[in-house]
Amino acid sequence: MTFSDYMDYLRGKRIGVIGFGVSNQPLVRVLLRNGCDVTVCDRRDRAQLGATGDEAAAQGAKFILGADYLEHLDFDVIFRTPGVLPIVPQLRKAAQSGAILTSEMEAFCNLCPCRIIAITGSDGKTTTSTITAELLRAQGYTVHLGGNIGTPLFDRIPDIRPEDFAVLELSSFQLHSMHCAPDVAIITNISPNHLDVHPDFEDYVSAKCSIYRGQRPDGCLVLNAKDAHTPRFAAEAPGRVRYFSSIGPVENGVYCTDGVIYRAHDGKAEKILDATEIRIPGAHNVENYMAAFAATDGLVGNAACVQVAHTFSGVPHRMERIRELNGITFINDSIASSPTRTIAGLHALPKPPVIILGGHDKHIPFDTLGDEVCLHAKAAVVVGETAQRIAAAIRASKCYDLGKLPLVEAPDFRAAVETAYGLAQPGDIVTLSPACSSFDLFKNFEERGNTFRAIVESLQ
């Protein structure tokens, strides 16, 4: 089905758009521009929607707003926001009544005229997606990068050519019950996450599986050789499977051994580059590069791989150096919204840091994080909803030594940053690496990182 055909199909149907956030605003504009009957459903009130709400109203949108925004979903087609899973009772009831449940991203995947490389996982999605896009661009392709990375693509479909590439970062919320058939899919890793939204861990894992379930036999799935869930994913994959590995050679894929990264085809290896040539630090970023190399194998040559490795300086809020003050270096790793990501950041730093931890409670365990903080941090400052849980995990660790690891609970975010600065000495590192999402105090991890930057820049 073409984009034009899809607009013809939707015209005349009652369309509900659940959530009026970043991804659904351009969707609403496109639907209204094409003469569709659109109702925006959002928990905010009319004033909170601001200028974008005024624009939609001027184009003919209707609204169901406030706390009961999910109670009257009498529509033929419903586009849900990623944050509202299709398993919520109101959406289930709507589906049982005949409504078609979809999303901006599912519609994009089904209508996109070019090849799609889709990336999911618990950690490293944005960096891997960005590296993949940079590799393709270095090879001369036109690339459309979007999805969970923050750039909606639905309204760009008419401008996408068959010879282009779409690189999509997909979250478990986007993938839940979604049908997609990417030409290449990557799963970076799997660890417990978002258990405040998913009913259980299996539901979270199953959502991730949607990235490959609809692939064609000629599709390719790229998997992490050391992840415990990889055998299951490989067995279920409809198409070819390639691996990226930091634990030894693989028959087909990309691996790193003795500090050298190779690509392998049927066991025959070819050097791509030395791991030390990668500009951004950390073993986890070597893995992100290997995943991207595996996904673009046959599309991107070694020269482009080396060029990107030498020049790509990373994505904001990911091990981002903010400033040095009185000999103390401040690192913004606000994206670290899970324990595994924070642990990877600790291992990437050249010395034990003063670490700022805590945020929104996603109901995931902190036991391993407690051990790693005791082993690899100089001091810890905890803040937010999870402050007491993280502090308890640190104190419960068999590695905990009160005399060696100062542990402070801060009353607010500014106090956390100022306390961390006070605990540091010249030559030390202070890192914001929360191991939690930001929604207790901030709209998103970007706002948290920007607030950290502003506080750090105000320090004397």
What residue ranges belong to the model's regions?
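N-terminal leader/targeting and accessory segments in enzymes
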Residues: 1-103, 107
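Nucleotide phosphate-binding/pyrophosphate-handling subdomain across enzymes
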Residues: 3-14, 24-34, 142, 273-379
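Residue-level signal for inorganic ion chemistry
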Residues: 31, 78, 119, 148, ...
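Phosphate-binding loop of NTP-binding sites
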Residues: 33, 71-75, 82-225, 229-240, ...
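Short internal beta-strands
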Residues: 37-44, 221-225, 356-357, 376-385
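Short beta-strand "acidic-cap" motif of Rossmann-like dinucleotide-binding folds
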Residues: 38-42, 145, 167, 243, ...
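Beta-strand->loop->alpha-helix junctions that form or flank phosphate-binding loops
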Residues: 39-43, 64-67, 102-106, 238-256, ...
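C-terminal helical cap/extension that packs against the catalytic core
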Residues: 52-54, 59, 367-427
